């Protein structure tokens, strides 16, 4: 099926162009000067190095960032450089998120820092490795292992990079595996609340994680774009790995079947209902795509 790429309404596109040309930003954008760190005497915001730009650089120069390169996204044991690895996935999340964030007038550095760091604690062998480690940890300690929690542990405890609360929270709350009908930022987060959320993730596992909502709209955008980045690419990789013969079973009149169609059309659908809002509503079409089509069709074929 050949699907026409959706376009933004002309009035919406005109408004976005005007806002960008005039430098108009969203009133819901999280400002660099409001970043919170455990050590507020270090890593202060400046013109040369804005707060969240610092977070980006800290993550990029982290030794564990290099380990993205050969970590499994979905398919392990394939000697094929055309199959997506974790390193490409985080770049795709960053690119899609920043594109949406630019149209919304949000903080692109905060979006990028969350996106680049969101899987830095992910396991080898993808979610299969994550489940296995969690089983071992529960057997020995009664606690749960989850990659989002380990990602912030890497940044905040193992390497102690003084990453901002807003970046850490966005990473902790990023899990695209748990969809919500509404993404409304939980404003006013403190490190005390954040630390409590982390502990609940260890003790309650998925039950606690699925209740998490980012404290910034930037974090909400990244969380949704984590889904957008993999729902088409994972299927494309399944064809490359010859697990699927073609993508016809994913055909949809709403979003198409190919990765490029999905990213474009989901971005347009999302943008139509997101302009300068305090929340992101996942409308019935998005819910159908993510909660029904992807889960129902993909899970019998392979596990993420």
Language model regions located:
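Post-HEXXH active-site segment of zinc metalloproteases
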Residues: 109, 113, 124-143, 240-244
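Histidine-centered, transition-metal-coordinating active-site segments
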Residues: 1-86, 92-100, 108, 144-150, ...
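Short active-site segment of divalent metal-dependent hydrolases/proteases
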Residues: 117-125, 229
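Basic, low-complexity intrinsically disordered segments
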Residues: 104
């Amino acid at each position: 099926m050949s699907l026409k790429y959706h376009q933004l309404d002309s009035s919406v596109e005109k408004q976005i162009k005007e806002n960008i040309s005039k430098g108009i930003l969203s009133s819901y954008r999280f400002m660099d000067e409001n970043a919170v760190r455990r050590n507020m005497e270090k890593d202060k915001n400046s013109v040369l190095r804005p707060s969240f730009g610092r977070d980006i650089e800290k993550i990029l120069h982290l030794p564990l960032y290099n380990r993205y390169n050969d970590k499994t996204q979905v398919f392990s044991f394939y000697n094929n450089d055309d199959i997506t690895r974790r390193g490409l996935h985080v770049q795709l999340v960053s690119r899609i998120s920043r594109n949406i964030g630019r149209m919304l007038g949000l903080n692109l550095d905060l979006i990028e820092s969350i996106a680049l760091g969101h899987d830095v604690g992910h396991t080898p062998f993808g979610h299969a490795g994550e489940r296995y480690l969690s089983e071992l940890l529960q057997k020995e300690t009664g606690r749960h292992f989850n990659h989002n929690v380990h990602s912030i542990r890497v940044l905040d405890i193992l390497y102690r990079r003084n990453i901002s609360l807003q970046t850490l929270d966005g990473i902790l709350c990023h899990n695209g595996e748990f969809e919500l009908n509404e993404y409304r930022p939980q404003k006013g987060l403190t490190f005390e609340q954040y630390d409590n959320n982390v502990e609940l993730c260890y003790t309650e596992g998925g039950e606690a994680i699925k209740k998490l909502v980012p404290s910034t709209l930037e974090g909400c955008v990244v969380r949704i774009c984590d889904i957008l980045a993999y729902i088409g690419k994972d299927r494309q990789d399944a064809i490359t790995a010859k697990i699927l013969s073609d993508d016809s079973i994913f055909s949809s009149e709403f979003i198409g079947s190919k990765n490029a169609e999905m990213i474009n059309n989901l971005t347009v659908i999302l943008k139509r209902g997101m302009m300068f809002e305090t929340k992101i509503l996942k409308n019935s079409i998005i819910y159908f795509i993510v909660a029904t089509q992807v889960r129902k069709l993909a899970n019998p074929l392979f596990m993420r």
